[in-house]
């Protein structure tokens, strides 16, 4: 049975999704979880695109050793040099060089002739191969490229040193049948294809990203590029969890498998969802809240008699089962053991912070579940360097015939406390108007979402917001037993991240000028 390499691009292509802006520490946390999942290759970012991306790729390359780390680079020596500086400490450095090959891209974007495109591809791949032991060449918009030209440039790239050839459906246009024909053509007609691994990368614009990826695997692809929860620009990318489970459940058909630890899928999905503030739909295949729910009486009866009547995927396979909940009598050692099982690897100081929050929650809830713990971990592991303001007190007064008023106290980084009151048409607006006044930012609320971490009257509230700040959007999240407190925390989290992002940009600009 063939082994399919899994190339996760959640931290690069996935982060291009509008509203996602991860910090370096958040990217590192996701990368560590991808390593635990068993991902073969992690595309950590685009080092030449910004100082922040460079730093994230560099830190991930220095920290994660169980997966191969790669970075994106245009077919330019400066991009490849930047990628090398960021990735050279990786256990197995590799670079992902891309160049457009479709007529529309060559003519209107690159403004190059086909001969010039081949020349640039060869030059860049050869240069990259002098530095990196593994070079991947992507023919951008391959699925709208002319096949004879595609054959020519693939052969040239392999001769120049490319060990992986990626054929992306950049705009999500093709059908599974068309993808199959393309990969069969390349496999049968590219004379030196035996010296490279074929890779597939599919977008989901027509809802066929996963189907196209599986079709490519059937037609000879040995590597699949995908993202957790299918995140990505426009309609997103092919979802890693769906591809992996499809190959597992239908191994009889595909005769292929991954090396993933599938029991980490649910945990990985939850982490990415929380850090990106992108909710997973309840009916999402494999990792959605309803993926293993059966409401129909006939279905429930069948499930009680034999689970295989209506369940082709077990919750245990993807790690969707909930273990026994913790309670107020649980000790620190048992709590630490449980957090380690969930993938937490923070300092003792951070552990104590989460443990204290856990004990406070136990006073309000009879049972604390894994979902609660995930929320507490996410709330406590934010980058402390970005905490310009901390919420210390919140009081909201409202009634049917009264104007909602919020009184808020914040602590600044220098430990000074400030207090302010403000009004709004509703309680949440009163809170946000007051916070905007206190932080001095000209922010507009782009999105506000609330969800309970789990069911029940005593459930934790988790609020996700996106605020518009100048020319970019920034997400924030807040968790609390009270929805108004969670709302305040979410807004403040987003504001703190905006401030940290601006300070970082100023520091990098100062370095350049000096």
Swiss-Prot record:
Region Regulatory domain: start-end pairs: 390-514
Pfam families from the UniProt entry: HCS_D2, HMGL-like, LeuA_dimer
Entries under SUPFAM superfamilies matching the protein: 2-isopropylmalate synthase LeuA, allosteric (dimerisation) domain, Aldolase
Domain Pyruvate carboxyltransferase: 4-266
Pathways involved: Amino-acid biosynthesis; L-leucine biosynthesis; L-leucine from 3-methyl-2-oxobutanoate: step 1/4
Primary location recorded for the protein, binned into one broad class: cytoplasm
Annotated positions binding Mn(2+): 13, 201, 203, 237
Disulfide bonds: none
Similarity-based family: Belongs to the alpha-IPM synthase/homocitrate synthase family. LeuA type 1 subfamily.
Protein name: 2-isopropylmalate synthase
